Amino acid sequence: MDQDALISKEDSEVEREASGGRESLSDVIGFLDAVLSSEPTDIGGDRSWLHNTINTLQRPGSTHRAKGEGEGEVSTSSTQDNRSGEESRVSGGTSEPEAEAHARNVDKQNIHWATGRGASTDSVPQDLGNGRDSGILEDPPNEGGYPRSGAEDENREMAANPDKRGEDQAEGLPEEIRRSAPLPDEGEGRADNNGRGVESGSPHSARVTGVLVIPSPELEEAVLQRNKRRPANSGSRSLTPVVVPSTRSPPPDHDNSTRSPPRKPPTTQDEHTNPRNTPAVRIKDRRPPTGTRSAPDRPTDGYPTHPGPETDATKKGHRREHIIYERDGYIVNESWCNPVCSRIRVISRRELCVCKACPKICKLCRDDI
């Protein structure tokens, strides 16, 4: 019996603590609801109605408990406290109409300032929690004296006249043209860019369209004359090909270090006097033809000397030089062309002349082809 009484007593204490926690929570919720649903006022405004609400919520007897003899505590509903708080707030609000009007004007100015600064206007009415429409005001009064922009007025005009927007869409004009900002001045753009002079890239710039002109013949001629007066670059190469005279390589038995014919072995007087030791070869007469200078005798060292030039009657200035000597028992007749257009070179009998004019002019070179 005692154990059952102890258990019932503990249960009643637990219920009392739980009901007390719920009542305190309901009081806090009612106070927060009253504060959030009320309109804000300025710093110097009257807040007596708020104190009345707080006093009403904290008034003793707002939440009364009825305790029976054999029963636990019974708490009343918290809706009565909330209703009493709202009634007191309404009574306090009606008693101060001037404070509410002043607070409403301050709220309108704050909304208009937030609209001009680009901030979201939906957050302001939502935080106020006055239960009214949270959209933008139709035409807030310009009490603060803030200047209105042309784009804002135009948006209001377009919203008021939907037919005008339909006409623009029918004509094919985008809506951004009416709201686009004016093109910045060239001087202002350069000043804002710290003197770098970056021009605007808008296609509607008058400076850009002024450059696009139709070229005239006079303009083209002036450009050509200016290009001709420019000095030629010294580092550029000339496109004219340089003709390099081709030289023919000498025969294998010819020595490039000397301009003389091949060396002839020395001969003695006994070879000419003794017919038994000499071959039966007729020695050609060394006398030059008529009209030429006589060639000197062959020196004893075997090196021939250049005789005088042979003048050709067909062309003046072209001559042919030759020499005849004996080598290894054979008579060698070497000749070379000496035109004015090339250097003197010793050539053999069966070799083409280095100058291409010899076969046509020289009589001795015609058989070499």
Swiss-Prot record:
UniProt note: domains: The C-terminal zinc-binding domain is involved in binding to IFIH1/MDA5. This domain is also involved in viral pathogenesis.
Which keywords does UniProt give here?
A: Host cytoplasm, Host-virus interaction, Inhibition of host innate immune response by virus, Inhibition of host IRF3 by virus, Inhibition of host MDA5 by virus, Inhibition of host RLR pathway by virus, Interferon antiviral system evasion, Metal-binding, Phosphoprotein, Viral immunoevasion, Zinc
> Region (Disordered) spans which residues?
1-24, 38-320
Q: Which family does it belong to?
A: Belongs to the paramyxoviruses V protein family.
Q: What's an example of a GO molecular-function annotation for this chain? A: metal ion binding
The keyword Zinc-finger appears for this protein: no
User: What does this chain do?
Assistant: Plays an essential role in the inhibition of host immune response. Prevents the establishment of cellular antiviral state by blocking interferon-alpha/beta (IFN-alpha/beta) production and signaling pathway. Interacts with host IFIH1/MDA5 and DHX58/LGP2 to inhibit the transduction pathway involved in the activation of IFN-beta promoter, thus protecting the virus against cell antiviral state. Also interacts with and inhibits host IRF3. Blocks the type I interferon signaling pathway by disrupting the RIG-I signaling pathway.
The answer to keyword Plastid applying to this record is no
UniProt name for this protein = Protein V
Query: Which locations, inside or outside the cell, does it occupy?
Result: Host cytoplasm
- From which organism does this entry originate? Sendai virus (strain Hamamatsu)
What Pfam families would the database entry show?
A: zf-Paramyx-P
Q: What else is known?
A: The P/V/C gene has two overlapping open reading frames. One encodes the P/V/W proteins and the other the C/Y proteins.
Could you provide one GO biological process annotation from this protein's UniProt record?
Answer: symbiont-mediated suppression of host cytoplasmic pattern recognition receptor signaling pathway via inhibition of MDA-5 activity
What does UniProt give as GO cellular component? Answer: host cell cytoplasm
Positions annotated to bind Zn(2+) 2: 341, 353, 355, 358
Protein's gene: P/V/C
Skewed-composition ranges (Polar residues) = 50-61
Q: List residues binding Zn(2+) 1.
A: 318, 337, 362, 365
Sites of Phosphoserine modification: 249, 257, 260
Q: How does it assemble?
A: Interacts with host IFIH1/MDA5 and DHX58/LGP2. Interacts with host IRF3. Interacts with host RIGI regulatory protein (via CARDs domain) and host TRIM25 (via SPRY domain); these interactions prevent TRIM25-mediated ubiquitination of RIG-I and disrupts downstream RIG-I signaling.
Basic and acidic residues bias locations:
7-20, 99-110, 150-168
